UniProtKB/Swiss-Prot annotation:
Record field: transmembrane: none
Broad class of where this protein is predominantly found: cytoplasm
GO cellular component: cytoplasm
Subcellular location: Cytoplasm
EC primary class: transferase
Domain of life: Bacteria
Primary gene name: tsaD
Example GO BP: tRNA threonylcarbamoyladenosine modification
Native source organism of the sequence: Thermosipho melanesiensis (strain DSM 12029 / CIP 104789 / BI429)
Name of the protein: tRNA N6-adenosine threonylcarbamoyltransferase
Cofactor: binding details: Binds 1 Fe(2+) ion per subunit.
Alphabetic keyword roster: Acyltransferase, Cytoplasm, Iron, Metal-binding, Transferase, tRNA processing
Binding positions (Fe cation): H110, H114, D296
Reactions that this protein is recorded to catalyse: L-threonylcarbamoyladenylate + adenosine(37) in tRNA = N(6)-L-threonylcarbamoyladenosine(37) in tRNA + AMP + H(+)
Length: 325
């Protein structure tokens, strides 16, 4: 089966082609440089760029995959969560293709796509497993059983990625904040500041990062000279400690031997390294996708569509910016 994946939920325009589980092409056009001067994604600008970028990205994806339009068997598109204008661009394009080619259409939850991205690297992955889903807009611990996804815990305020962006702004760094903090943190002392770890010792699996962000702000206000590298490193350590403590706690509590990372923040090398250290210590299998499958891409939407397609087409898909699992 040839599956076309389309992803336009935020500021990446992405199209991928899969033959069953094999990637034939995966093309991503990023808008980071467009939004950098605004310090974050501007929804209207994002939608307009998707409109102009999507036809080009689509053409490149087909060309790289060496297929024609008529070779497509299934169209898989993100329908939420995300920016409504951005989502509508991808959905409208996918619906038009579905009608023109008379090929089935399936809508995919963006978060589910991040989970299924792991199947691109680990095709033999079998439930049950625990997922740390951590991105700019979402931070959740998920329990995967067969095709059922149970949310064990989630952030009660800021997502981890949001906290990175906000602390980066406090430090006067660029956008996106996560990579900027990671970049300077490698030159800092991660024990220079003992920032709080909200909910670290709570019995549940929920997160809270707004207090940590505020603690960073108050700490900086008290300093005459801001050691940015040390602040970034200490903040990164605090976030990582919280995320991994809760994730591996969930795995042990549920007696599950496999932990999977997913989402854009899972591209953070410090997080990946610490997760590997803990997994070895605890004797738990850790699976981490390559960085290109952590950040937004359409291959994850295509693989999710391939695995979840039940033979029925859904042309009634609508953009759901606040879609939950």
């Amino acid at each position: 089966m040839i599956v076309l994946g389309i992803e336009t939920s935020c500021d990446e325009t992405a199209v991928a082609v899969l033959e069953n589980e094999k990637i034939l092409s995966s093309v991503v056009s990023s808008q980071i440089d467009v939004h950098k001067k605004f310090g974050g994604v501007v929804p209207e600008i994002a939608a307009r760029h998707h409109l102009s970028n999507l036809p080009v990205v689509f053409k490149n994806a087909l060309s790289q995959a060496k297929i024609s339009l008529n070779d497509i068997d299934l169209i898989s598109v993100t329908y939420g969560p995300g920016l409504i204008g951005a989502l509508l661009v991808g959905i409208s394009f996918a619906k038009g293709l579905s009608l023109k080619l008379n090929k089935p259409l399936i809508g995919i939850n963006h978060i589910v796509g991040h989970v299924y991205a792991n199947y691109l690297t680990y095709p033999n992955l079998k439930p049950p497993f625990i997922v740390l889903m951590v991105s700019g807009g979402h931070t959740e611990i998920l329990h995967i059983q067969n095709e059922k996804i149970e949310v064990l815990g989630k952030t009660l305020d800021d997502a981890a990625g949001e906290a990175f962006d906000k602390v980066a702004r406090i430090l006067g760094l660029g956008y996106p904040g996560g990579p900027e903090i990671e970049k300077i943190a490698q030159y800092g002392n991660d024990k220079a500041f003992n920032f709080p770890k909200p909910l670290y010792d709570s019995k549940d699996y929920n997160f809270s990062f707004s207090g940590l962000k505020t603690a960073v702000l108050y700490t900086i206000k008290k300093l005459d000279k801001i050691p940015k590298e040390d602040v970034a490193a200490s903040f990164q350590r605090a976030v990582t400690d919280i995320l991994l403590h809760k994730t591996f706690k969930a795995a042990k509590d549920k007696k599950i031997n496999t932990v999977v990372l997913a989402g854009g923040v899972a591209a953070n090398k410090y997080l990946r390294t610490k997760a590997l250290e803990i997994s070895k210590k605890e004797g738990i299998i850790l699976l981490i996708p390559p960085i290109e499958f952590c950040t937004d891409n359409a291959a994850m939407i295509a693989i999710a569509g391939y695995k979840l397609f039940d033979g029925t087409s859904d042309l009634n898909i609508d953009a759901m910016p606040n879609l939950n699992l």
